[in-house]
Design a protein with these regions (language model features):
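Transmembrane alpha-helix segments characteristic
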Residues: 50-60, 119-122, 234-235, 240, ...
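Signature aromatic-anchored transmembrane alpha helix within multi-pass, membrane-resident enzymes
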Residues: 115-123, 288, 326-330, 457, ...
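Membrane-interface helix-loop-helix junctions at transmembrane boundaries of multi-pass membrane enzymes
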Residues: 111-114, 225-226, 231, 276-281, ...
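Gly-Asp-aromatic-enriched flexible segments
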Residues: 89, 631-661, 667-671, 677-682, ...
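Multi-pass, polyprenyl lipid-linked donor-dependent membrane glycosyltransferases
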Residues: 141, 206-211, 235-265, 270, ...
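Membrane-lumen/periplasm interface segments of specific transmembrane helices
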Residues: 310-400
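Membrane-embedded, lumen/periplasm-facing catalytic core of multi-pass transferases
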Residues: 483-540, 553, 623, 652
């Protein structure tokens, strides 16, 4: 074959852009009318549309009727298992489609020469990234929350974030789990990776680079097929891979990199399966991919329309196909939908701006374009870029988009792509409706990542089409020129701005990143059993440190404080960072919080020693205090602990040489006196005095300084005749404020009534209704009820017990510092409903059902 013939065959094989003639010159309106006529819609399609709408309406009604409390509980209890089932379905989809892929793969792949070009591009990107971009967090609170979620999925198989916890021998014991309005996909990926590598932040930071490389390969394969030109696909891939924001995030732990990876996988899969060869087997892979895609960012569910439109002819063939597809996608995407219900009406900013509005849309649109066109540099950092956007790329994008719109409107070109693209952009509109969708908030400039693949596609296609149309040059030559221009621009700009990458452009202004890196190195030298009090405890957990929030630490009783002093060997540290100074700016669009008041209160309430201060590095003093003791409380009481009961024994520990005398009682019966002379002593309880159900040991100890310390130790002996209410599943609940808490108050503190702590029970809030289905055979319900001591301003509340809809007991009106014991007969009752009813108002009515349990006589 001659060289000319070979080149001609390459042109025919490599390009699929039609000549400008005939149908191409139809008006846009005429093209749409012809398309609708070609569908030959009839009664079956009307049925299909009706059923599809019904499925969507049913899903919306379920979503709209989910209570916030129920949605949040479901998120924690079932979030992990939901995405795990989607992962299993994904594996099944891959296995089922292996024969189809093996049969058609060779015809799908572009030429070996084009793969060599892609390989060179990937090598350049990789060398540049590892040489110029540090591997670190860039959006600290979000990235560490996914890491903490991954830890919780790995250790506990639940769907929330471990907000507070303790590391013991490499295992995280989560003390407080909270919801996360972010998606679960990245956390789940971490939970898988933690099976093979250390479960910590350093492992998490290694995950995104492979996603980055895989996304560029998938993007190239998809566009090679759709463009019919591997050169044009390589141009778009160069634009995508060289975007500064993408390069930076690929060396972080951001979910947007996984988002792009999954999107490009979907693009490649859709390009691989022609519309005339699609079967149900292909959707067995498509649906779980969409499920994972939806759980990268919750707004992604608004981008699903084009994934159905692409195969519209397949769906039109059978009336059940589209409704089945919609129902399946809703099922695998439900965790994201549930998150929207869980945070419905949640005011993230707490300021003067509406969470979602058209004002936000216009403000964000204007400010984002201005930011992406920003030429400003920072002379104090050697003239580096202040924003991770190339102005050149933004100009190309704007011009290319306008050109393609003109081509569509005037010449009727790219209509199908426009329709698919505009539906895909629904998620972008949702983001920009949000108050924090503006790039004036530096860390939110990463939101542009959801649109980067589309931007790269438009840039390459717009340049190619404008060049080919205006010069009438051969399409192969036009594609080659665009490829060369894209590669030269991308690689040249990367090299020119290498100092900006090395100085972590944009993110160098985020003081919290420097604070995190400093603490990660500094705290590594502290004792392994140290406990840190910090505004972002989940971040500490991801670094492998035990941590609690300032608010939780404030709520520690002397007994609890002594317990943690014992466990930590006296190594409790308060870390005061950026969050510990100033007040929240209510006029700002930035999501923020401050713990200044809590820290000041802790420093006033505890004796402490300042062990580290750095006042220069961050623009504010970063201080670490070692907590010594509580002020105004016996030093001996803070160094005396009593263990929980285990096998009929309780261990008493003291961290001082003097002897102390204690008397103790068991279930309100005095048992005797103890003289403690050793550092630790073991007390064996009288087994005859221990009863089925609830037990309480009470220790009253005289300290060397004449102070008296009282410590309660509750334990429950479960049997077929005694069961804790908190061990039963709560079938449903409604609560006017907060969520019911198991063995904690509604604000996550120890249940405390009239100064008396309780180990077991349910913390609630008026007005509330907690419903249980009871096992058969139980005759009595026991509880101690009242308003928790954490709520001192309530005007009283009633505690009501209902059985099978009938009122069985009602407490008197209980005020703060009051409690009442309830012993209610429930023989034959199947449905138990516990209500807390407010007095004149519900403010501060934190109602506790302490020591609630069932007994069979």
């Amino acid at each position: 074959m001659s060289r000319r013939e070979n080149k001609s065959s390459v042109v025919k094989k490599d390009l699929s852009v039609k000549k400008e003639s005939g149908a191409e010159k139809k008006s846009l309106a005429q093209s749409l009318r012809d398309w609708v006529s070609s569908l030959m819609l009839g009664k079956p399609h009307a049925v299909m549309a009706a059923v599809s709408v019904a499925v969507l309406l049913a899903a919306f009604l379920i979503f709209n009727n989910l209570t916030v409390s129920y949605a949040r509980r479901w998120d924690i209890d079932w979030g992990y298992y939901s995405i795990l089932s989607t992962f299993v379905l994904l594996i099944a989809g891959i296995i089922v489609n292996i024969p189809f892929v093996a049969k058609h793969l060779k015809g799908f792949l572009p030429s070996g020469k084009s793969f060599c070009g892609l390989a060179l591009l990937l090598i350049f990107f990789s060398v540049f990234m590892f040489g110029n971009i540090s591997n670190t967090h860039r959006v600290l609170s979000d990235e560490t929350s996914w890491e903490s979620m991954g830890l919780q999925m790995y250790f506990q198989h639940t769907g929330g974030i471990c907000n507070e916890g303790v590391w013991t021998d490499g295992v995280l014991d989560c003390k407080t789990e909270v919801n996360n309005f972010k998606g679960k996909a990245l956390g789940f990926v971490y939970s898988l990776v933690f099976n093979f590598m250390e479960p910590d932040r350093d492992t998490a930071l290694l995950v995104n680079y492979p996603f980055y490389i895989l996304s560029l390969i998938a993007f190239f394969l998809a566009l090679s097929k759709w463009f019919g030109s591997s050169k044009l696909a390589l141009a778009a891939t160069a634009f995508l891979g060289g975007m500064p924001i993408y390069l930076l995030q690929a060396r972080s732990a951001s979910t947007e990199v996984l988002y792009i990876c999954l999107l490009t996988f979907l693009m490649a899969w859709y390009a691989f399966v022609p519309t005339n060869k699609v079967t149900w087997k292909h959707f067995l892979l498509t649906v779980p991919l969409l499920g994972f895609f939806a759980q990268t960012r919750q707004e992604t569910v608004f981008a699903f329309v084009p994934f159905a439109l692409y195969y519209y002819r397949y769906f039109l063939e059978k009336p059940y196909r589209l409704p089945a597809f919609i129902a399946s996608v809703i099922a695998v995407s439900w965790p994201s939908v549930n998150n929207m219900a869980a945070y419905r009406g949640y005011d993230f900013q707490g300021g003067e701006h509406a969470a979602h509005s058209f004002d936000n849309l216009w403000f964000n649109l204007k400010t984002n374009i201005v930011t992406m066109l920003n030429f400003d540099t920072d002379p104090s950092f050697g003239g580096i870029m202040t924003n991770p956007f190339y102005t050149t790329f933004t100009i190309i994008l704007l011009v290319a988009t306008v050109w393609l719109l003109v081509r569509m409107i005037v010449f009727g070109r790219y209509v199908r792509g426009f329709i698919l693209g505009i539906f895909f952009c629904l998620q972008i509109f949702v983001i920009m409706f949000n108050v924090s969708g503006t790039f004036t908030i530096d860390i939110n400039q990463r939101y542009v990542l959801v649109a980067l693949p589309m931007f790269a596609l438009l840039m390459a296609l717009g340049l190619y089409d404008a060049l080919e149309f205006s010069t009438k040059m051969r399409k192969y030559a036009a594609a080659s020129i665009v490829m060369g221009l894209a590669c030269v621009l991308t690689l040249g700009l990367m090299l020119y701005h290498a100092p900006s990458y090395r100085n972590n452009m944009l993110y160098y202004k985020n003081k919290l990143l420097g604070e995190e890196e400093f603490l990660n190195n500094e705290l590594a030298s502290y004792p392994a059993n140290s406990v840190f009090i910090y505004s972002r405890p989940w971040q500490m957990l991801a670094q492998g440190h035990s941590a609690f929030s300032e608010r939780t630490f404030e709520g520690w009783s002397t007994d609890v404080f002594a317990e943690w002093m014992q466990k930590s060997g006296g190594n409790i540290y308060l870390v005061r960072g950026q969050d510990g100074y100033g007040k929240v700016n209510r006029e700002s669009r930035v999501v923020g919080f401050k713990t200044t008041d809590q820290i000041d209160k802790i420093l006033d309430s505890y004796k402490h020693e300042r062990v580290l201060v750095d006042a220069k590095k961050f623009g504010y003093p970063l201080v670490i205090y070692k907590i010594i003791s509580k002020k105004g409380v016996s030093h001996y009481a803070q160094n005396f602990t009593v263990s929980e009961q285990m096998d009929g024994m309780i261990v008493l520990n003291k961290r001082f040489p003097e002897s102390i005398a204690c008397d103790y009682s068991l279930n309100d019966e005095k048992q005797g006196d103890i003289l403690l002379t050793l550092e630790a002593d073991t007390l064996r309880l009288d087994s005859l005095k221990i009863r089925n159900g609830m037990n309480r040991a009470l220790f009253t100890c005289s300290m060397p300084d004449a102070d008296t310390t009282i410590i309660y130790r509750d334990f429950f002996l479960e049997s077929d005749r005694a069961v804790l209410l908190s061990a039963l599943k709560m079938e449903r609940y409604a609560q006017d404020w907060g969520d019911p808490q198991v063995n904690q108050s509604v604000e996550h503190h120890r249940l405390t009534l009239d100064g008396e702590p309780f180990r077991y029970g349910i913390g609630s809030h008026a007005n509330s209704s907690l419903e249980y289905t009871l096992p058969r055979g139980f005759d009595m319900f026991h509880a101690v009820v009242g308003l928790d001591d954490e709520s001192a301003c309530g005007d009283g509340a009633y505690f009501v017990v209902l059985g099978d809809g009938r009122e069985l007991a009602r407490s008197k009106k209980l005020y703060s510092m009051e409690k009442q014991k309830l012993d209610v007969e429930i023989t034959g009752v199947r449905h138990l409903n516990l209500k807390v009813e407010m007095g004149d108002n519900k403010d501060c009515d934190h109602g506790d059902w302490a020591h609630s349990w069932l007994e069979a006589r």
